[in-house]
């Protein structure tokens, strides 16, 4: 898994059908109609840790392979 910037993760989730609902503090909150829970993506100037990216992918209901195709 490559190291990604927060903007890259948000863009990939948007391609997967997620919408930005709000930008609260240092996090972007994204929703998708068929998921009950929102996805929170940290918006820091540095790259996201691999564990954080994997957690976001898991919460979004995607596999790593599906997510990589969206990049």
Language-model regions, residue ranges each:
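Basic nucleic-acid-binding interfaces
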Residues: 1-23, 27-71
């Amino acid at each position: 898994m490559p190291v990604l910037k927060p903007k890259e993760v948000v863009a990939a989730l948007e391609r997967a059908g997620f919408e930005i609902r709000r930008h609260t503090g240092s996090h972007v909150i994204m929703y998708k109609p068929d998921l009950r829970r929102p996805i929170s993506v940290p918006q820091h100037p540095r790259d996201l840790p691999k564990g954080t990216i994997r957690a976001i992918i898991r919460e979004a209901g995607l596999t790593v392979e599906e997510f990589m195709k969206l990049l």
